[in-house]
Curated annotation (Swiss-Prot):
Disulfide bonds: none annotated. Part of the 30S ribosomal subunit. Contacts protein S5. The interaction surface between S4 and S5 is involved in control of translational fidelity. It comes from Cyanidium caldarium (Red alga). Keywords: Chloroplast, Plastid, Ribonucleoprotein, Ribosomal protein, RNA-binding, rRNA-binding. InterPro entries: Ribosomal_uS4, Ribosomal_uS4_bac-type, Ribosomal_uS4_CS, Ribosomal_uS4_N, S4_RNA-bd, S4_RNA-bd_sf. This is Small ribosomal subunit protein uS4c-1. GO terms for cellular component: chloroplast; small ribosomal subunit. It comes from the Eukaryota. Pfam families: Ribosomal_S4, S4. GO terms for molecular function: rRNA binding; structural constituent of ribosome. It is found in: Plastid, Chloroplast. One of its GO terms (biological process) is translation. The gene is rps4.
Length: 202
């Protein structure tokens, strides 16, 4: 399954607020195709599927990527759900977004892919690159890159900076300073249901 490129508002109306997907706000809180809200009770499978889709769309990853992250998280020590979120939060495209350098995950991925971002003073153009504690992420020192980021930074890109990042707005960069906590995740999600979704699918 490839990444979704259709109307983002439809996704938000179906799944709820997804801060990384779009900066647009939803006027209607009912799912697309319905004229009013209902109290329809979702099945356990539907709830697990919904949580899985939240992660996919918010982090801008496809089904194959998410399945791979879950598989890797299951092999880790400690909480599988927490490790899954850590893998997602430490993606370079997500770090760029959470540092306020891009308005959406799609815009962040584009910045990385077009070689505007450096990690530890070296250009990295792989959005899925896993950042670690101590890594420094900066905008490339070129007029084109800096002007592009300056335009992005003037938008409402993020409501708060996660505690695992030390952000330097003036220098257009950030440093990973600690391990992620659940409170750092800018998304209402039950990650255990996502793990359970794939466990039941085998």
């Amino acid at each position: 399954m490839s990444r979704y490129t259709g109307p983002k508002i439809r996704i938000i109306r179906r799944l709820g607020e997804l801060p990384a997907l779009t900066t647009k706000k939803v006027k209607n809180n009912y799912p697309p195709g319905r004229e009013w809200s209902t109290n329809e009770e979702l099945s356990e499978y539907a709830i697990r599927l919904q949580e899985k889709q939240k992660i996919r769309f918010n982090y801008g990853i496809n089904e194959k990527q998410l399945r791979r992250y879950v598989k890797k998280a299951k092999k880790s020590r400690g909480s599988t759900g927490s490790y899954l979120l850590n893998l997602l939060e430490m993606r370079l495209d997500n770090i760029v977004l959470r540092a306020g350098l891009a308005p959406t995950i799609a815009a962040s991925r584009q910045l990385v892919s077009h070689k505007h971002i450096e990690v530890n003073n070296k250009i990295v153009n792989i959005p899925s690159f896993q950042c670690s504690i101590g890594d420094t992420i900066h905008v490339k020192k070129s007029n084109k890159s800096r002007q592009l980021i300056d335009l992005n930074s003037r938008r409402d890109t993020t409501k708060f900076f996660p505690k695992y990042l030390e952000v330097n707005k003036d220098n257009m960069g950030a440093r990973v300073v600690k391990t992620m906590d659940k409170q750092d995740v800018n998304l209402t999600i039950n990650e255990l249901l996502v793990v359970e979704f794939y466990s039941r699918k085998g």
